[in-house]
Amino acid sequence: MGESYLLDNEGMKNRDDIPNWVAKEFNNFSNVVLEPTFPCYFGLTALKKNELRYSFLSRNDWSHLPNTMLSFLELMKERPIVRRGFFLFVEPEREEQPLEYYRDYFWKVLQYLHEKDNQTWPKQIPKDPDHYLWEFSFGGEPIFAFGNAPAYKQRKTRHLGNSLVIGFQPRTIFDGLEGDRPKGAYSRQMVRERVKKWDQLPKHPNISHYGDIDHREWKQYFIGDDIELIKGKCPFHHKVKL
């Protein structure tokens, strides 16, 4: 495996071979997520226990990202019982940009990962994003991805600092917590009630659970700062084998 920058809490704060902005943005992220009333109890607890993993993306160099993601997936296999998340911090813009800019950037990162993926797309995952069972995959693993950005003003739970922060959660961490199971439905309901209180907005209409036949997974990857349905086609394109 080539160069990889898979970091834990300590690495994000003190590594001397990474850009200076990384520690600052990790501090911003931590200040939000460690707020006692932060809606995602999973994220808060995992951060405290040093179970989350992170990396960074410089504006002009994405080359380490595929290997870093593979390192994370390998870590998941070592201790599958730990419900880890992976958060990618993108170098902040010199001036804050509109939400659509960050959404476009988000999809470019996912597309880049897909283009660099040398492993076979999972057989059980459709290749058409308009299929209700489609979801992003990398390294042979289905993964839930979601964007957070400084342009979110209403949805404060999605504003984690000056960086675009992309969260990646392998589908395996949701085993036993699926939305159509009592435990999963209860957990989601509790989190969504807390999110509603933080954001002072109702649940976004594109938020649902994986497997809902009326749901399109890609639409909840980067929701709006509002309660408007996301329209149009998915920006993601499955690569064509030559």
Describe every region a protein language model picked out.
Residues 125-163:
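Aromatic/basic-lined ligand-recognition segments
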Residues 92-96, 172-174:
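A generic structural motif
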Residues 54-55, 105-106, 146-148, 167-169:
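Active-site ExK catalytic segment of metal-dependent nucleases
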Residues 79-82, 137-139:
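Flexible, charged surface loops at secondary-structure boundaries
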Residues 95-98, 154-156:
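A generic structural signal for short coil/turn motifs at secondary-structure boundaries
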Residues 1-81, 87, 91-93, 101-120, ...:
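Non-catalytic accessory regions used for complex assembly or targeting
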Residues 100-107, 158-164:
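"Short basic amphipathic alpha-helical interaction patches in structured regions
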Residues 151-192:
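Compact mixed alphabeta submodule
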